[in-house]
Amino acid sequence: MDVLGENEALQQFFEAQGASGTLENPALDTSLLEEFLGNDFDLGALQRQLPDTPPYSASDPRSPPQVKGACCRTPRPPAGRIPAAFLHSTTAPGPLPEHPSQSMAGQTHSSFQNGYPESSHPATCRHQTGPSRLGTSCSFHQQPLCHVPGSSLPPTKKRKHSQIQEDSWDCSSWAHYFRPMTTRSQSIEVQDHDREGRNGMPVDQCSPALKWQPYQSVPWHSLLNSRYEKLPEVGYQVVTDKGFTFSPVDEAFVCQKKNHFQITVHIQVWGSPKFVKTQVGLKPIEKFYLKAFGIKVEATNQVIAIEQSQADRSKKTFDPVKIDLLTDQVTKVTLGRLHFSETTANNMRKKGKPNPDQRYFMLVVGLYAANQDQFYLLAAHISERIIVRASNPGQFENDSDALWQRGQVPESIVCHGRVGINTDTPDEALVVCGNMKVMGTVMHPSDSRVKENIQEVDTNEQLRRIAQMRIVQYDYKPEFASAMGINTAHQTGMIAQEVQEILPRAVREVGDVTGGNGETLENFLMVDKDQIFMENVGAVKQLCKLTNNLEERIEELEIWNKKLARLKRLSSSWKSSISEASSISKLSRAVSASSARRTGSKKPTKVSFSGRKQSCPNWVFQTLVVVLIAVMAFCALTIVALYILSLKDQDRRSPNLPLSNMTSSPEPALSSTAPTSAPHTTPETTQTSLQVPEITFCEILPCQETYCCPVWGPRILFSSPAQRQLEAEREIHQRQWAEDKSKSFLTSSALISPDWESDWIDTTIASIQIVEIQQMIDRRYCSRMLHCGPGHYNYNIPVNKNTPTNVKFSLEINTTEPLIVFQCKYTLGNICFRSQRERTQSDGEDAQMTQGYQHIWRLPVARFSDSAYHFRVAAPDLADCSTDPFFAGIFFTDYFFYFYRRCN
């Protein structure tokens, strides 16, 4: 029929729709229809732009037929570009396109809102009542959509379309089948939208979504650009929006034939495709089409046609849909109101159970490139198996009697199969996604009659493995915790990958697990904590063995300690034994002389014979005594000589203190002792004081004022009670140490035997420093008047007169072995604060201690004119402040520090 004018065209259009009289509606904007009729269009384009939901359906929203990037409007194709084989009938009415101004304003016209509701703006997955909506909202958590900035749909007053989510697409999902091509900025965008999408409903609270996988019935064709360069494979993903429900009994998705279903296809093209590579060469691309059809599982060559509901509730064969693919963008195409043209075979149940001869369909959605009515497959996806029934699928879900039965024991229920709680894919007899409370005990079979190959394990290896395991604190990801029903996200445990390297049999792969954001974790790992528990039992047994060995060794050490004490007592009685031996020899001489006289007076006839007979034993005895005394004297001289040589050798030997700060100048001759009987001694000389560096804070603090020095003259040595008490204590220790040292040579060979050398502990200090100024205390501070060598070290440390009284002194003592440092005694001299009493002496013997390699002591040096401290560095459990000084240099080493302000 010829169209003479726009008014006649409008009249015929509305008569075909059965909407005569709507032109009289004052709310109708005819400019939109006039613009539409004024342009060229074809019926195929109208058919492609049909609404997704017929006007009579109030429960299903309409979605746009095609979304580029983020639900953009589909541009009108030029006329005459769709093959005749795919054109719809001319009687099929087409929808009117949206006016640009109307889309921007977000307004609707009353005459069209009942027939063709506008597409809503993007909405997130919301929890809604009704089983159909529940499954739909779940699928979009599993297959999110990538948002393209700058594109959005206008808001509307209609019900929001929950199947469109431009702000939650995960671009990384393409990488499962295709090479990733997203840029850096796109990746950041995806993460932001993923976090927004996690606020939705957990996956396990929804029905499972229909899964898709690549399908290649024929080889896929490659795309080339204008320079004949091969482009990467097309990113292609199919998402099921609605229309399918999962039947646990049938273990398949079920679709009702009279109810329509809807799918959404996401397409990503990299570059600008211009040619398609075929078997006969390169062909220019004219159009891109989407085609959907079904196939039978048992016979994949048999195609099942797909139908689409029209606006007048009639069904027509679904023809390929022409689409426009933009360069380097995600194109979203929604195919709605689809039906299978026939049902599957053998749908009826047998005695309430699924039919063993049940037949299935599979849905295929492919992307084609067209050239002169020839179609070339670019990508295709195929769904899981589907059951298509003519009646409501809910009528078939009466499966409680088939799964659960009463047991033989009273009040018991039996399930012959796998049970899943909060999960629809149980792979064990019972799988619980969430917390579980067990008030009783969990029993395991352990009867020896059902075991074989019983072998004793190596507890040493179990201890080694347990020592390698790392215990960590962690938080489950929110989407995973919500999907698996984990209420307490923060937990303490192990990492399965780390345990797998140490104890592989304690880790199991349970297959693929889908998280709350749709991310699939391949070969998910779980830990068998029972195996780790048994490893702990073996490790504890090994620790018990080690503890017993240590106890035995401690007992042996105690025995050696008793032997050492006995040797000490023997050495103390050695001198008395020597004197007794000399007296016995003298007594024997006198006795022999008197006996000779008596025998001579009684028997004069045998004087010569008996005299020779008695004189020989006396001479031999006297000779032996003289030789013995000479040998003992020689031994004593040898011991004294060795002792003197050892003392000289020890003086020449430097202690284990750092000598990095020592200069080439001779050792300072700091006089730290003087006779206590002299009331006053001469002050220190200037030369001596300059050779020892002072403890000064002038590098970090201003040195302008003098603290804690008398105004009437220079400081006199040893006028402080701290110095006098320290010197008295030092002299006592020196005398005891010297006496014990002379005795120790008798037992030194027993103490330092090859058996003890391996366990000998070095109790000397590796380094000493003032922490605040990093000042090392070394041999330069050693006292010249007192012993400063193995066993006892005496240090005289001058403090600069400009040192404030409120600075902190931290003495750091470093050892090469883990030792214990005791502060056995301290003595404080004159206090520097003028507001308090001028002279205060305080001392203490409350022993304090530190352990380890590094020992830091806070000392009140700056607040006093002088102070003295006695530290004892001892081996653990072998010495303390009350240990006999005899063991100095063996079990402990004494250190005396005397700090004084140098005021001259």
UniProtKB/Swiss-Prot annotation:
Biased amino acid composition, Polar residues: 100-117
DNA-binding stretch(es), residue numbering of this chain: 108-400
Domain of life, source organism: Eukaryota
Stretches the record annotates as Disordered: 46-132, 656-688
Record bears the keyword Cytoplasm: no
Database matches in PANTHER family: MYELIN REGULATORY FACTOR-LIKE PROTEIN, PTHR13029
Protein name according to UniProt: Myelin regulatory factor-like protein
Species this chain originates from: Mus musculus (Mouse)
Organism lineage: Eukaryota, Metazoa, Chordata, Craniata, Vertebrata
